[in-house]
Swiss-Prot record:
Catalyzed reactions per annotation: an N-acyl-L-alpha-aminoacyl-tRNA + H2O = an N-acyl-L-amino acid + a tRNA + H(+)
Function: Essential peptidyl-tRNA hydrolase component of the mitochondrial large ribosomal subunit. Acts as a codon-independent translation release factor that has lost all stop codon specificity and directs the termination of translation in mitochondrion, possibly in case of abortive elongation. May be involved in the hydrolysis of peptidyl-tRNAs that have been prematurely terminated and thus in the recycling of stalled mitochondrial ribosomes.
Subunit-structure text: Component of the mitochondrial 39S ribosomal subunit.
The UniProt record lists the keyword Ribonucleoprotein: yes
Species assigned in the record: Ailuropoda melanoleuca
Similarity-based family: Belongs to the prokaryotic/mitochondrial release factor family. Mitochondrion-specific ribosomal protein mL62 subfamily.
Annotated localization: Mitochondrion
Top EC class, one word: hydrolase
Protein name (record): Large ribosomal subunit protein mL62
This protein's record includes keyword rRNA-binding: no
Presequence extent in this chain: 1-29
Key words of the record: Hydrolase, Mitochondrion, Protein biosynthesis, Ribonucleoprotein, Ribosomal protein, Transit peptide
């Protein structure tokens, strides 16, 4: 390996040895590429999350989080986080990114009573013995995104339970009646065939 400093001795002058000024050996220059020309992977954070601008602060809970969720009172929800089994690699073993949101459905005054009753029927498998509706999300490695997904699920449930069935038109009602009559006619035909088969078996045994 060549030394970085070259110290050659010069000729002796006036009874003393003179040293030449140190010379730095040439090194490979590192040229920085122009802005916008550097290589970026398709999986870089700037491309996966263009709004983050390379910073994790974009996924932190903002100070005005309650103002952006006026339709769902966060103070009436029980929010907790735990280990996630979703995407994130080693990150899932270090942070609690899985979000769990629960609230007591029967006493949620911010939801209309008919809507609550319909939600209790439609989502009875998500209600525990205490009457709490439990929602979880682990679609992301960030807590705030999983919390936002749980809140969106609540909005979707409320919107689905708030829909009123449309009154069928005369044509649809007539078609529905014809289908029911055909189903009953086919059911009776199969019963008569089955009864005739059983009667034939009893005659053969006698």
């Amino acid at each position: 390996m060549a030394t970085a400093w070259c110290l050659p001795w010069t000729l002796r002058r006036a009874g003393a040895w003179l040293l030449t000024p140190p010379l730095r050996c040439p090194r490979r220059a590192l040229h920085k590429q122009a802005d916008g020309t550097e290589f970026q992977s398709i999986y870089s954070l700037d491309k996966l999350y263009p709004e983050s601008r390379g910073s994790d602060t974009a996924w932190k809970v903002p100070d005005d989080a309650q103002q952006t969720n006026k339709d769902i009172p966060l103070d009436r929800l029980t929010i907790s986080y735990c280990r996630s089994s979703g995407p994130g690699g080693q990150n899932v073993n270090k942070v609690n990114s899985k979000a769990e949101v629960r609230f007591h459905l029967a006493t949620a005054e911010w939801i209309a009573e008919p809507v609550r009753q319909k939600m209790a029927i439609m989502h009875k498998n998500k209600i525990n013995r205490s009457g709490e509706l439990i929602l979880t999300s682990e679609c992301s490695r960030y807590q705030f995104r999983n919390l936002a997904d749980c809140l969106q699920k609540i909005r979707d449930m409320i919107a689905e339970a708030s829909q009123t069935p449309k009154e069928p038109s005369k044509e649809d009602a007539a078609l529905h009646r014809i289908r029911i009559e055909n189903m009953n006619r086919e059911r009776l035909r199969k019963k008569r065939i089955h009864s005739a088969i059983k009667t034939g078996r009893r005659v053969d045994m006698d």
